[in-house]
Structures are given as C-alpha cells and as structure tokens.
Amino acid sequence: MAGPFSRLLSARPGLRLLALAGAGSLAAGFLLRPEPVRAASERRRLYPPSAEYPDLRKHNNCMASHLTPAVYARLCDKTTPTGWTLDQCIQTGVDNPGHPFIKTVGMVAGDEETYEVFADLFDPVIQERHNGYDPRTMKHTTDLDASKIRSGYFDERYVLSSRVRTGRSIRGLSLPPACTRAERREVERVVVDALSGLKGDLAGRYYRLSEMTEAEQQQLIDDHFLFDKPVSPLLTAAGMARDWPDARGIWHNNEKSFLIWVNEEDHTRVISMEKGGNMKRVFERFCRGLKEVERLIQERGWEFMWNERLGYILTCPSNLGTGLRAGVHIKLPLLSKDSRFPKILENLRLQKRGTGGVDTAATGGVFDISNLDRLGKSEVELVQLVIDGVNYLIDCERRLERGQDIRIPTPVIHTKH
C-alpha cells in the first residue's frame, strides 16, 4: 500500500487541497505550485486573447482545424486543478504544423481533467480523429474476452510478427507532458511494485534505462522490445523527453512476450508480442496479462484513469478509449506499389507505418499495419477488424502474385454505442 505522503502527492486534486491543510506551508508550496500558474495567468491578462491567438494558417493538424479565435478566447484563461493550460495543450501542434498529406492530432493532455476543462476543443478533435465518435453523446465499451476472436492465424509467408499494445495511466498523477520528477518517479514505483506480483508465464523483472549500458539499450531497441529517447518534434515539443532517462524503464517476462514500458509517452504501455502470425494467442496473453496488472494495481490502492465517455485516458487524444493498437509486420512488396493501396487501407480502417514504426521507412516491402481507431469500438472489435483486414491484404498480395486484379473493399462502418 502506498505510504501517506506518497498518496498525498498523488491524491485527486480536490482531495489534495484538503489533505494539505495540515501538511505545512513547505508541502503546500511544493505540491500545488500556485505562483508560476498565477504569474502566467497575470501575464496573459495584459493582452486580449486575440493578441495571443496562434498563427495556424499553414497548419495541418486536428487542433488547428478546430481552434477558432472564439474557442481560444473562451478557454485560454482556464486551468485544470494542477495548473495545466490550453496553451500547454496545443503547443506541440503550434510548433509542428504537420505534413500536407498526414494530419496529426496536434495537442496533448497534461492530466485527467484536461479532457473536461478544455472539452470545447478536445471533443471536436476527438470526433474527427475517431471516425465520428462523439464524446458528448456516446459511450465507450470495453471487452477483453479473447475467446470471442474468430480465426486469428495469419499465413506466415507474409506475416512476420504479431503484436497488441495499449496504454494505461495511474489516476491522481499528472500525465508525462506535465508531470514533475517526483510524480514520474512515483509512477515508476507504483507500477514496478505491482508488476512484482505477476506469476507463471507472466513473471519477469524490471530494467531501468539509467542502469543499462548503451549496448544493452541498443540491443533491446533493435529487437523492437525497448523504446528509444523521443526525438520526434511532436513528442519533444510536448515536454515528454524531459529529464531523460530518469524513472523510465522496461519490464518484461522471461520469454519477452509480455512487456511494460514505463514513462515513455504514457505512464505505461502494455505489450503482448511474438514472432509469426498467431494473433489469437498474442491477444489472449494481452487480455490475461492486462487484467492481472490492473488487479495488482488496484490491490495496492491505485486505479487507472477511465470514464464512460472516453474510455481509458491517455496523453494523446488519438489513444483514448481502448488505447489499443493491434498490428503485424507484413510483407506486401506488390500491393504496396499499387496506387490503390492507400485507399484499401483507409476503407479497412487500417494504418501503415514503416518497418521500424512511426516516422520510419518500409524496408523490403515490410510494413507495420495496425488499426486506425481506438475509441468507440471494443478491444475485441478492433482486433477482429485487424484480423479481417490483414487477411484481405494477404489475399490482395496473392492475387497480384498470380497476375489477377484486386478491388477496393467497401468502407468499414463505424459502430454507434
């Protein structure tokens, strides 16, 4: 169980104020940090919102599409209970206009309350990014029953590896763009303590980045087990690389088939992976491991951030809901050269990345293919969508090998909840 001062550090903001009443002026000054927030607010009042509104005329991201001068004026002086502001939410999207053909989200959350305090901007961004899901009227569903999956065994002449991942955030602690060093270390302590309770094929150990040699780190990165220091401007502009590698690390079981990343883009990333095409087995391990991790977290007096509108709360709005990305490394040397490939992926609600993941190129016709959506569909629905979609891509590749024509599939319809 977390100690009294640790729980004080991570209490929900409303409770934190009450708890601090008897904690002394030093603790109050350290934990609440009111002066910088007040000073920033006073500086903004010297100028009207119109003078502070960012120049977004050349931007191609979801934030820029929905942040009108009126919305900015309405939200710019608001803060969450921990002091997170609208300008901090949008700074990464202001600094990174985006690619003409790739529309990014362009904003991040600093804590759980961000999505409520700045809902006038986040809700339309979420609706655009998640295929029409309206968080004002719809509810998200969770389903981790792997027995519902149909098929799930890919032809391994095409599929090289299978993987399912998600993220989870510890309630009461700021998200990575906003967390202090103490909060980040508290996330690590809470998570590692819980993971020590995993048994059987899930049992393993934790490795701190700060205690690894460069050779050990690089080997884990090359094997696609470990995250590297963020270099993407989208992440660095959001403040997610601060104090690197303090309180970051990886936990994995003995077989390296179940992994937890700690304090990368989110508090945790939970990953099930293996070589080959047995997606059903990967998802079964994922569901079993994730349920056990949540049980161990709750057993120690903590819980994950979640609500019925947005599902599981994570740093980037693109990962809300399930936070789930089910993907494969797949060889598509012919289909990838076909002009219809992007439209096929779009209609199947799939996205492609390079062989090494986001911001990398494809090598030898090998792509990382995964689900595009996270919110509004359950985990089971998304994994089944990937299974059906990847099988369609394999069928297209086979047809092209035989010199036959392929067709663009009917678009996947978004299920309303």
Curated annotation (Swiss-Prot):
One of its GO terms (molecular function) is ATP binding. The keyword Protein biosynthesis does not apply. Gene3D superfamilies: ATP:guanido phosphotransferase, N-terminal domain, Glutamine synthetase/guanido kinase, catalytic domain. It is a peripheral membrane protein. Keywords: ATP-binding, Kinase, Membrane, Mitochondrion, Mitochondrion inner membrane, Nucleotide-binding, Phosphoprotein, Transferase, Transit peptide. One of its GO terms (cellular component) is mitochondrion. Mitochondrial creatine kinase binds cardiolipin. Exists as an octamer composed of four MTCK homodimers. This is Creatine kinase U-type, mitochondrial. It comes from Homo sapiens (Human). The lineage of its organism: Eukaryota, Metazoa, Chordata, Craniata, Vertebrata.
